Design a protein with these regions (language model features):
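Metal-coordinating catalytic core of metallo-dependent amide/deamination hydrolases
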Residues: 1-111
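C-terminal cap of metal-dependent C-N hydrolases
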Residues: 225-273
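Catalytic core of soluble alpha/beta enzymes
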Residues: 75-107, 112-126, 139-150, 168-174
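Divalent metal-coordination and catalytic microenvironments
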Residues: 42, 72, 110, 124, ...
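His/Asp/Glu-enriched, well-ordered alpha-helical/loop segment
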Residues: 92, 99-105, 149-237
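General structural feature for long, well-ordered alpha-helical segments within catalytic domains
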Residues: 21-24, 38, 51-58, 93, ...
Length: 273
């Protein structure tokens, strides 16, 4: 759970003073400190909407309450340049968060990461940060396509998200399919630099890699929480499909009507969704 911070370059009705933003954030952190069900995280909207005093203040709160950070990173070329304009003396977008101490006390989660520089990638890898691919959102805002294959090959952690503000649905399974589709487009336009990812690659990033943000979730391995969906794949009795083909079918054409049961930490959820 997070509380978004922004004290500049934002609509007036969303802009806080630096002092109020830090005060309300600390109040929220203190309220949930020690909770077994709620994990807190800091959420500066992104560097262009946060002053240096705000970013530095959030870094101090991260140290005090031992929490991580969730924000956007190099979502667009404009964002990357604007961040450096507002933070002179910094060499990359990621360095803004690193120097503030926001990447030292918990998971650091960065949405989009479409135009990472070598310095951005070095910092992300150093801190074991998660770059979150949000396929639908990047299309909707005409941002670009994450270089997932390259980042994966360089050992960066890649999770997957829906970006409920920039996206248009909360089903992560559809993002799995969309990630494959976008990788095909990237290969088409950059055949010498990019290659298509497989459905199993995308599924791994959406499940085990994403789940590792929270601990041992996202896998059916021993010792992991049993979080699962029971899916009616509507398989034709005369059609033999592999497990991978069944997964692919659901990700591309399935929806919530195919989900017959949901388990969280081994418990069957009884309520309807």
């Amino acid at each position: 759970r997070d509380r978004v911070n922004m004290d500049c370059n934002s609509p007036e009705f969303l802009t806080e003073t630096t002092e109020d933003s830090l005060k309300e954030t600390e109040k929220y952190l203190a309220e949930h400190e020690g909770s077994k069900k709620v994990k807190t995280i800091l959420a500066p909207r992104f560097a262009p909407t946060c002053s240096k005093p705000l970013i530095d203040g959030l870094g101090k709160l991260a140290a005090k309450y031992h929490c991580g950070v969730h924000t956007h990173l190099v979502e667009s070329l404009w964002e990357a340049q604007e961040a450096l304009n507002l933070f002179p003396g910094y060499s990359s977008d990621a360095e803004i968060y690193e120097r503030a101490g926001l990447m030292d006390h918990g998971p650091s989660i960065f949405a989009h990461v479409i135009f990472p520089t070598e310095e951005d990638k070095r910092i992300l890898k150093k801190h074991g940060s998660f770059s979150v691919h949000c396929p639908d959102a990047t299309v909707n805002i005409i941002a670009g396509i994450m270089p997932l294959q390259h980042m994966e090959a360089e050992g960066l952690k890649i999770a997957m998200g829906t970006d409920i503000a920039g996206g248009h649905g909360i089903g992560i399974y559809r993002q799995v399919a969309r990630a494959v589709q976008l990788s095909k487009l990237k290969e088409f336009y950059e055949p010498q630099e990019s290659k298509t990812i497989t459905i199993t690659q995308a599924f791994y990033h959406a499940t085990k890699e994403s789940g590792s943000v929270f601990g041992k979730v996202g896998s059916f391995e021993k010792g992991y929480a049993f979080n699962a969906l029971v899916i009616d794949n509507m398989e034709d009795p005369w059609t033999k499909m592999t497990a991978e083909e069944k997964l692919e079918r659901f990700c591309y054409i399935g929806d919530d009507r195919n989900i017959k049961a949901r388990y969280i930490d081994g418990e069957l959820l009884e309520q309807e969704f």
